[in-house]
Amino acid sequence: MGSIDNLTEKLASQFPMNTLEPEEFRRQGHMMIDFLADYYRKVENYPVRSQVSPGYLREILPESAPYNPESLETILQDVQTKIIPGITHWQSPNFFAYFPSSGSTAGFLGEMLSTGFNVVGFNWMVSPAATELENVVTDWFGKMLQLPKSFLFSGGGGGVLQGTTCEAILCTLVAARDKNLRQHGMDNIGKLVVYCSDQTHSALQKAAKIAGIDPKNFRAIETTKSSNFQLCPKRLESAILHDLQNGLIPLYLCATVGTTSSTTVDPLPALTEVAKKYDLWVHVDAAYAGSACICPEFRQYLDGVENADSFSLNAHKWFLTTLDCCCLWVRNPSALIKSLSTYPEFLKNNASETNKVVDYKDWQIMLSRRFRALKLWFVLRSYGVGQLREFIRGHVGMAKYFEGLVNMDKRFEVVAPRLFSMVCFRIKPSAMIGKNDEDEVNEINRKLLESVNDSGRIYVSHTVLGGIYVIRFAIGGTLTDINHVSAAWKVLQDHAGALLDDTFTSNKLVEVLS
């Protein structure tokens, strides 16, 4: 026994470090909360978009990791002086560039608890609460959205929390692929065709590449301004018939509720009718706008989802849940499981073999998974359906107000209908005296975008709709209020005025010289 005791003492002396001592964790945890609270108190004062140049951080950080420990105080000082200057502040109330990554006290605290527990909930046995809470909150959320019962666990379907929409689309596409190939034969993968619009998020194209779909069989159907950039059911059916005539196999349709470029909503009832006629898997991507559909006045945009096979939205976008949390519901979980399940010996257990539990490892690409359900549960309980609806309505109201400001200024025009909390607008051709060429109008709008973003006062982004360069003004930040919207519009007006004056002066000079 003596030799074992000596070995125990020796090993104990070799590992003196306790990296999770409760009282030190408490002390440092308070420091971190204080740091973040101070950050949020002054986040509005930072330039919204980072002003650094590529490679700035490598120039100011050491070439190798420290040999000796450093204090949290020292590390946080470096965060303040070295990291924050290189952050684009997504939580700034003046961030209007992309769909929000909305945060909240409840979301942060749920994330903290999830990270603190640090469980790896790949199946029911390794953390029953992680699995069962996810079952519950996805059913809760599904009921809030009035999803068909067939998408809920209580109706034979079910929900799963993925990291992002990219993962959700890939999982459903793989499930659709394998279901089809079991019917038509594995050697027909080169004949499978995926359909979407030219407004569909690029996540689908990436998923199709990963899933082995021939790039020649990816159909991004053209949309038009006259139809508000919706996917046209007649064009979809025409594309399907053309592919069938050429011996191809229509596989998968992705319809969108709230496109990234303009937030348009594809006509789900007509599209699903066409898709079901030809036995396509239908996925509805509502990454951004899906959250709004908990409000009765927006639920209409999900009409037709009852004919879809899967549906997803990002709670981390407009639902106060913090990145990452994508909710995916499927009508037939067995389709996912057949494609994504693995059951090596070291994962076998009695609970799984009863087939009475959900093993979420078989609903996703990865094996390991985080306890995401905690933060969604915290958000749902902390704010309730009523306050969550008002949060969304507040942003929609601000967008409506901004739209009114744009319409009152004769130099600008709204380019696409505003449905939710984003406005697509531009300096219109008539504001540019003697310059009605579309390329020149696009260029002045590009310069406006660069000018306001370089100022650091606000951050906006752009898209191109039907050849028109458009500025996107997306409202959704947790800290944004009507005063920030008004101030942002003043920034845009001032910069537009300066650019138009310069353009007018340049044109006059050209006239004189000619």
From Swiss-Prot:
The EC number(s) given in the record are 4.1.1.108, 4.1.1.107
Keyword Transcription regulation among record annotations: no
What keywords appear on the UniProt entry? Decarboxylase, Lyase, Pyridoxal phosphate
A Gene Ontology BP annotation from the UniProt entry? carboxylic acid metabolic process
Q: How is it used?
A: TYDC-2 from parsley can be used in E.coli to produce 3,4-dihydroxyphenylacetaldehyde, a direct precursor of hydroxytyrosol, which is a natural compound from olive oil with a strong antioxidant activity.
* Pfam assignment, any one: Pyridoxal_deC
Q: What turns on this gene? A: Induced by fungal elicitor. Induced by methyl jasmonate.
| One Gene Ontology CC term in the entry | cytoplasm
N6-(pyridoxal phosphate)lysine PTM positions: 317
On whether Hydrolase is a keyword of this UniProt record, the answer is no
Q: Which domain of life is it from?
A: Eukaryota
The entry's L-phenylalanine-binding residues are 100, 201, 316, 346
InterPro entries in alphabetical order: Aromatic_deC, PyrdxlP-dep_de-COase, PyrdxlP-dep_Trfase, PyrdxlP-dep_Trfase_major, PyrdxlP-dep_Trfase_small, Pyridoxal-P_BS
Q: Which family does it belong to?
A: Belongs to the group II decarboxylase family.
What is the documented function of this protein? Catalyzes the production of 4-hydroxyphenylacetaldehyde (HPAA) directly from L-tyrosine, tyramine not being formed as an intermediate. Catalyzes both the decarboxylation and deamination of L-dopa to 3,4-dihydroxylphenylacetaldehyde (DHPAA).
Assembly mode = Homodimer.
> Under what name is this protein listed?
4-hydroxyphenylacetaldehyde synthase
Native organism is: Petroselinum crispum
